Amino acid sequence: MLYRDEAIVLRTHKLGEADRIVTLLTRQRGRVRAVAKGVRRTTSRFGSRLEPFTHVDLQLAEGRNLDTITQAETLTPFSKGLGLDYDRYTAGTVMLETADRLVAEEREPSVQQFLLLVGGLRAMVAGEHAPGQVLDSYLLRSLAVAGYAPSFEHCARCGTLSAEGAHRWFNPSMGGMLCSTCRVPGSASPAPETVALLGALLAGDWAVVDPAAARNLKEASTLVAAYLAWHLERGLKSMAYVER
């Protein structure tokens, strides 16, 4: 059966002498793996349309294990904009790997994750905000869509609001900020400004994020990375290339 969908190319790997298996995050069918036949030949009709970061409109033939790409048209070549800036490119690779890991089930619709990734890549290319903060905002929101929303205002354990404006303790395994009563050993103690920044990153409140102090941005990035690693159960390979 043939079907059409739009997708972001997450990654590819070689298959045989001329083909590739392409991992896609599609709008309607979630994560899909498909064969692109002959794509590695110089005469391939696909050209560079099936490279990572490309937003494409596809026609595919459904298969038992792997679908087959029969047509591909580029909608947005995000790689062109990202390739001009190392920091934006490496941050973008983290976004792709995160989407690949958080949308674990194949062919399970995940429209919100797809739209979030497209929006995140578009923001990364636009360059209106620092790449590190675009990445952190994407990571928090992607985790929230996947069901791992962190709690920054209420205690993640008992649900109380802080009388002082922000709880003091942060623990990834507990789901975010903790009050003094619920604090567990090994919890971090971020600055109140950092806690407010984390909430703004989750909400996409750039009026708060953009003017934030460097020390708070760095502390927030460290906590976001720790929260992501906890819920993915292991770190991302691409994160090693991002300056945090």
Swiss-Prot record:
GO terms for biological process: DNA recombination; double-strand break repair. The keyword rRNA-binding does not apply. Keywords: DNA damage, DNA recombination, DNA repair. The keyword DNA damage applies. InterPro entries: ARFGAP/RecO, DNA_rep/recomb_RecO_N, NA-bd_OB-fold, RecO, RecO_C. GO terms for cellular component: bacterial nucleoid. It comes from the Bacteria. Belongs to the RecO family. Involved in DNA repair and RecF pathway recombination. HAMAP family: RecO. This is DNA repair protein RecO.
